[in-house]
């Protein structure tokens, strides 16, 4: 990275918020964009961000798979794969699971357990049974792997789903252990009043049933990339306390296919909490934000009369030269205007491909792009706000499920600049600043980070239940 390393650090540390954007001019992506709504249906979430030293591998590390498969062989222990089973396989997680299974078979793994979280994309029990049968057929074919945990998932912040995760966590740490149920049993536990995704949790966990328990020197791989569920789950496993008061054996080896570069966050930021971290970075005049948007880049520079001159780049159709084109547009536009906001494509969407090789290649391109952006902005002394795909989907109008997901967390942002904040007009005369005018545009950014609002001296709407990092 460049001298400040600020982008990479914040990408590893912070969650973020989705920016709701005006539908006009946005590239339609499959059936994700509801043309009757100003909101987008985006299937993404916070990446896995473990910060224990022993969880120190990412898919960009060439030794990742060597260590992953060597551990269970060395200790004559089990390999456990944890991830989501989805009807539409939107992120290709099942393809990755199958590839991991084949690699494990080739490396001589003899005991492999699969722990599945079933998302709410399945609308009928036949659809779920078919997907489970497809996976079972594959494991039978290669003669490796068994599904030992099935749990439902929906919105993590609902109590019913916390019980699902307690069921899955119990499989890791002992106490009440997880009973493996057949697909038919899982489906029969469904709460018919609330729909198929509301699986009754209490019958999933029973005392004395040891099948599939994770313990000792076992190795765990989280093969899912994109759900804030997994950040929540791994943090509960890693820190071994909090909601469930559970602890994991120190000998347990945990790996993740996170698209973030796993690092020693505490050594980078010795501050005790996020506010201290924020203040620490602020003193260096490099403050804040990361937000998210789907598979296109959204380059938003300001014109002199505060009208937006957007540049849309369709990621799907520009995969080969996407980052070069984006960087070129950034350079050509950023020097013309006082303030530039760049929303790069979601990290999950931008890098995840149907093979590990392509995914690693895309990940490397992505981080090279971040390095180039950082270097350019700091060299040119530009005032620049970078938003990226890192975080929970908050305040998103989910048309399919008619559900509003509330914002629970503070949302940071990144301002890259060598300017002093007062000279950049971020805190003086906010009512006349370009930022104030921009943020008040109708049908543009409908939901912005509380921290960003406070930084610009603007009121935080009651609709944002998250809090500013400056508080």
Regions found by a protein language model. Give the residues of each.
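Feature captures the catalytic ectodomains and active-site-proximal regions of enzymes
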Residues: 1-471
């Amino acid at each position: 990275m460049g001298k400040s390393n600020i982008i990479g650090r914040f990408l590893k540390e912070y969650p973020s918020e989705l920016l709701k954007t005006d539908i006009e001019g946005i590239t339609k992506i499959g059936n994700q964009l509801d043309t009757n709504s100003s909101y987008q249906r985006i299937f993404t979430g916070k990446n896995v961000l473990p910060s224990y030293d022993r969880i120190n591998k990412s898919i960009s590390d060439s030794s990742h798979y060597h260590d992953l498969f060597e551990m269970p062989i060395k200790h004559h222990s089990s390999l456990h794969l944890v991830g989501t089973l989805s009807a539409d396989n939107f992120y290709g997680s099942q393809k990755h699971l199958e590839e991991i299974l084949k690699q494990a078979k080739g490396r001589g793994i003899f005991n492999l357990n699969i722990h599945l979280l079933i998302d709410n994309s399945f609308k009928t029990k036949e659809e779920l049974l078919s997907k489970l049968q497809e996976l079972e057929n594959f494991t039978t074919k290669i003669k490796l792997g068994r599904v030992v945990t099935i749990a439902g998932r929906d919105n993590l912040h609902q109590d019913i789903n916390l019980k699902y995760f307690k069921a899955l966590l119990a499989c890791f740490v002992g106490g009440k252990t997880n009973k493996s149920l057949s697909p038919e049993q899982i489906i029969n536990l469904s709460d018919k009043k609330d729909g198929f995704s509301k699986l009754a949790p209490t019958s999933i966990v029973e005392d004395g049933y040891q099948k599939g328990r994770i313990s000792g020197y076992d190795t765990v791989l989280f093969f899912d990339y994109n759900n804030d569920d997994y950040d929540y789950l791994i943090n509960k496993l890693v820190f071994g306390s909090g909601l469930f008061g559970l602890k994991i054996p120190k000998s347990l080896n945990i790996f993740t296919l996170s698209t973030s570069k796993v690092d020693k966050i505490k050594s980078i930021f010795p501050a005790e909490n996020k506010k201290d971290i924020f203040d620490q970075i602020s003193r260096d005049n490099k403050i804040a934000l990361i937000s998210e948007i789907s598979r296109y880049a959204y380059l938003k520079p300001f014109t002199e009369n505060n009208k937006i001159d957007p540049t849309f780049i369709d990621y799907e159709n520009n995969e080969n030269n996407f980052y070069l084109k984006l960087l070129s547009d950034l350079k050509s536009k950023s020097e013309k205007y006082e303030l530039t906001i760049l929303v790069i494509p979601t990290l999950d969407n931008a890098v995840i491909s149907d093979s590990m090789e392509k995914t690693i290649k895309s990940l490397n391109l992505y981080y090279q792009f971040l390095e180039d952006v950082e270097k350019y902005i700091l060299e040119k002394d530009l005032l620049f706000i970078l938003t990226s795909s890192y975080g929970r989907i908050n305040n998103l109008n989910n048309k399919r499920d008619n559900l509003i997901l509330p914002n629970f967390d503070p949302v940071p942002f990144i301002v890259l600049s060598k300017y002093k904040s007062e000279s950049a007009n971020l805190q003086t005369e906010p009512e006349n600043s370009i930022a104030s005018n921009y943020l008040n545009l109708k049908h543009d950014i409908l939901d912005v980070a509380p921290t960003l609002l406070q930084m610009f001296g603007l009121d935080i709407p009651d609709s944002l239940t998250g809090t500013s990092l400056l508080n």
